[in-house]
Design a protein with these regions (language model features):
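Peripheral, non-AAA+ core regions of ATP-driven protein-machinery
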Residues: 1-215, 219-225, 326, 462, ...
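Basic, amphipathic alpha-helical bundle interface domains used for macromolecular binding and assembly
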Residues: 35-46, 61, 68-78, 285, ...
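Residues immediately C-terminal
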Residues: 112, 298-299, 305-306, 392
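P-loop NTPase nucleotide-binding/switch module
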Residues: 171-206, 210, 240-290
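Walker A/P-loop
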Residues: 215-258, 320
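The Walker A (P-loop) glycine that initiates the GxxxxGKT/S ATP-binding motif of P-loop NTPases
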Residues: 218, 280, 302
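Walker B catalytic acidic pair
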Residues: 295, 301-302, 313
């Protein structure tokens, strides 16, 4: 048979669209033509594949070869198609049965010796292959990652000759079984390790219970970073769908091995990070920090030290839960449903309001420092809290109920109420959901309107205040939002926006 078809997968963002590798052998002078919009790395595949076939002791067809990677309008890059191209050549030249390649997808880069090297982005391809009911052939180094897609039949290989023997029936390969090495979770740091800061811990609990964004402001050394790092431990465990989304993003970003499966991510980029590092980008779009924090926590320490233009790009994903990166030929959509936790000092030196009087910043310096944060960005942060310095002990005794397990139990109860009532966390309520689930009595509504006018709160800030009040009521396991919930939620708003 002079025509063979092999199935493979490309990588576009966190998606893995299907690619059909068609190999045709014709009479004529020996040559190889590769079509289907291949990038440079794919065009180089023909040399790698030829050397791999010859060095494996197999016959490279001395005929006119045409390779088509369909669909032609899908950009293709990397060495992930090497294995599919090699199998297509061998099947078209009769060295292995072409019918054996039906319902089988192949991924892998070939070394010149015929060894099969690992690639990135295997998990999205594994999930897509599982949805199609296909078997997936991957490099042995990627097999454990592919097995995260439970129910998928995975064939793990180290060398091209193993596959030839497998398809010819001489040495069938047993489907790979996961060893479970990637299912080990690291313990979260405990909330009881944070001394004092009762108000800040309360705000952290509220943020976890409703998936609210949070901003800590205070002098250095008051525990802002310590508090933020405890938030992932308070959040409910990821379900299988969420865990696979997180793992797929890490796979695409080469964050392997996936030793954190199935934990929520905690990302802490440096304040010198560029816009592309934060939201993603590049000539070949790659996920940024906001995507790597999907279903987890994005912690921005020293918030005003970030470039203002970088911070402003957070506004859209904070509302929509995704980011779209457009290039000349590509338009890639990355998920970005993260929980923002930020920390900042009250002034450039950090000691404004300290009893010691150490602050020497002028009014102009303080105003210029705070003006780095725009009103629309601050509007999108639900909880604003000043973390004051407290007296500390060298060996503090943890308080009863002041630990991660106790707080996480309260969060789980509140989240369960929200899922039963509206199917999402309170922070993600849309306007119709807000009207339906955050209704107030006439007296409380008038009281809230007066408070919003005095504090000059925007309509968006008022809506976020209502969502926080809804979360406070859920923590108390009550259905109606009361005046006490509104009053506490109001305390978490800055005095001006």
């Amino acid at each position: 048979m002079s025509l063979a078809i092999v199935l493979s997968r490309a990588q576009v963002g966190v998606e893995a669209p299907a690619v059909t590798v068609e190999c045709h052998l014709a009479n004529g002078l020996p040559a190889l033509t590769l079509v289907g919009l291949p990038e440079g790395a794919v065009r180089e595949s023909k040399d790698r594949v030829r050397s791999a076939i010859l060095n494996s002791g197999l016959e490279y067809p001395a005929r006119r070869i045409t390779l088509n990677l369909a669909p032609a309008d899908l950009p293709k890059d990397g060495g992930r198609f090497d294995l599919a191209i090699a199998l297509g050549l061998l099947a078209a030249s009769g060295q292995l049965p072409a019918h054996a390649l039906q319902d089988v997808e192949c991924l892998g880069e070939l070394a010149l010796s015929g060894a099969i090297r690992p690639i990135q982005g295997v998990l999205p391809a594994a999930l897509a292959a599982r949805a199609e009911g296909h078997t997936l052939i991957v490099p042995a180094a990627n097999a454990e990652e592919a097995c995260l897609a439970s129910g998928l039949r995975v064939i793990a290989v180290n060398h091209l000759l193993e596959l030839v023997a497998h398809f010819n029936g001489r040495a069938p390969i047993v489907p790979y079984e996961s060893s479970g090495l990637l299912h080990l979770s690291k313990p979260y740091p405990d909330l009881s390790e944070v001394q004092g800061q009762t108000a800040a811990k309360r705000a952290l609990l509220v943020a976890a219970a409703g998936a609210h964004n949070l901003l800590f402001s205070g002098p250095p050394g008051t525990g802002k970073t310590l508090l933020a790092s405890r938030l992932p431990g308070l959040l409910p465990p990821l379900d299988e769908h969420e865990a696979l989304e997180v793992a797929a993003i890490q796979s695409v970003a080469s964050q392997s091995p996936l030793t954190s499966w199935p934990q929520r991510p905690f990302r802490q980029p440096h304040h010198s990070a560029s816009g592309a590092a934060l939201v993603g980008g590049g000539s070949r779009p790659q996920p940024g920090e906001i995507t790597l924090a999907h279903h987890g926590v994005l912690f921005l320490d020293e918030l005003p030290e970030f470039d203002r233009k970088v911070l402003e790009v957070l506004r859209e994903p904070l509302e929509s839960g995704h980011i779209v990166i457009a290039r000349a030929r590509d338009r890639v959509r990355f998920p970005a449903r993260f929980q923002l936790v930020a920390a900042m000092n009250p002034c450039p030196c950090g000691y404004l309001g300290e009893p010691s009087g150490r602050c020497r910043c002028s009014t102009e310096q303080i105003q210029r420092y705070r003006n780095k944060l725009s009103g629309p960005l601050l509007d999108r942060i639900d909880l604003h809290l000043t973390v004051a310095r407290e007296a500390t002990a060298l060996n503090p005794t943890p308080q009863t109920g002041d630990d991660t397990a106790s707080a996480a139990a309260l969060v789980a109860q509140a989240r369960e109420r929200q899922q039963r009532r509206q199917g999402c966390a309170n922070a993600f309520l849309d306007l119709p959901g807000l009207r339906k689930h955050c209704s107030l009595s006439s007296a409380d509504e008038n009281w809230l309107e007066t408070a919003c006018e005095r504090l000059t709160l925007s309509l968006r800030a008022a809506h976020r205040l209502l969502k926080v009040a809804r979360t406070l009521a859920d923590l108390e396991q009550v259905d109606a939002i009361g005046r006490s919930h509104l009053a506490e939620a109001l305390q978490y708003r800055p005095s001006s926006n």
